[in-house]
């Protein structure tokens, strides 16, 4: 499969002084879209009231069904549907950029959807969409996951020019593939909305997030599902924000809530000047 790159450009004004508050939402979503949207609205308000200008929801925030096929039934066409209407209206109402960790978007393949990360600006406009490229598969004891049975993989690396710098979009299992982030170029912020299992999360989650931040000298915001779900699945949680030096700025081990921190682009630039690792890269073929 050929992977392409795309950058979405925004006309928004850059944030003054290079400092902005960013927030991640942690949830334990269930099979009711209405209930999940209500919880997301509550948590987005908390983040906005604390001064966040960018709020990122976890993977599958709108539906964690009893069966994998539940998300296929809940899939929407791009540009319409209750989930997207909620995201647009809430971004405008709260005057924040909202990144919908992922929602199911209809595909051309019967019985399958795209697992799509949708980015809305503070006017409620959809400015970018990323379809998850790497589909999770696990066969470990009693745990078996095969996302490819209901999801069509994406084929584009997506970045967004925003008031908060250049943002790279990814979802959950993508975190294990550093070449994806290298393909983004020099981004200021990587987003990794996730639903890591408890098994893989407790073993690898923090290590992977901090590694991506350090090797790319950028901020990483990783909001996650955290708790027990109607399917019997347990997700790891531990949503976190990590700075370009690998320091964890905020984290939430379990349950619903918000992580929030200030992103300082001047600090990031100083680190990249002191340790110019990005300019020292050698690309091997």
Each predicted region: which residue ranges?
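N-terminal, active-site-proximal structural segment of metallo-dependent hydrolase catalytic domains
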Residues: 2-54, 60, 64
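Beta-strand-turn-beta hairpins that frame and shape the catalytic cleft
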Residues: 13-22, 159-168, 189
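Short, glycine-anchored, charge-dense loop/turn motifs used at functional sites
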Residues: 22, 119-127, 242-250
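Cys-nucleophile CN-hydrolase/nitrilase-fold catalytic domain and related Cys-dependent amidase chemistry
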Residues: 33, 42-123, 197-218
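Short beta->alpha transition motifs characteristic of CBS
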Residues: 63, 69, 118, 129-136, ...
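Active-site catalytic loop in hydrolytic enzyme cores
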Residues: 76, 108-185, 198-207, 270-277
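CN hydrolase (nitrilase-like) catalytic-core segments centered on the catalytic cysteine
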Residues: 78-99, 166, 172-259
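Short beta-strand scaffold segments in enzyme catalytic cores
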Residues: 100-102, 116-119, 158-160, 239-241, ...
């Amino acid at each position: 499969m050929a992977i392409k790159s795309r950058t979405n450009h925004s006309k928004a004004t850059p944030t003054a002084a290079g400092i902005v508050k960013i927030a991640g939402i942690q949830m334990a979503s269930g099979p009711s879209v209405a209930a999940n949207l209500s919880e997301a609205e509550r948590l987005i308000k908390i983040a906005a009231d604390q001064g966040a200008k960018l709020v990122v929801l976890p993977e599958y925030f709108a539906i964690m069904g009893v069966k994998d096929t539940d998300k296929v039934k809940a899939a929407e066409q791009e540009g319409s549907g209750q989930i997207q209407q909620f995201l647009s209206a809430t971004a405008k109402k709260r005057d924040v950029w909202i990144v919908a960790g992922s929602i199911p978007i209809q595909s051309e393949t019967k019985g399958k959807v795209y697992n799509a990360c949708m980015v809305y600006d503070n006017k409620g406009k959809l400015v970018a969409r990323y379809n998850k490229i790497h589909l999770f598969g696990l066969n470990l004891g009693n745990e078996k996951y095969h996302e490819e049975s209901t999801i069509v993989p994406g084929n584009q690396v997506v970045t967004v020019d925003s008031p908060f710098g250049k943002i790279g979009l990814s979802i959950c299992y993508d975190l294990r593939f550093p070449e994806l982030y290298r393909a983004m170029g020099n981004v200021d912020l990587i987003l990794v909305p996730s639903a890591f299992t408890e098994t893989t999360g407790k073993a690898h989650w923090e290590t992977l997030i901090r590694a991506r931040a350090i090797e790319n000298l950028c901020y990483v915001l990783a909001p996650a599902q955290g708790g027990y779900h109607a399917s019997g699945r347990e997700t790891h949680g531990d949503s976190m924000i990590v700075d370009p030096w690998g320091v964890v700025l905020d984290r939430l081990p379990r349950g619903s809530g918000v992580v929030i921190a200030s992103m300082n682009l001047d600090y990031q630039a100083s680190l990249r000047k002191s340790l110019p690792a990005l300019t020292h890269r050698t690309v091997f073929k």
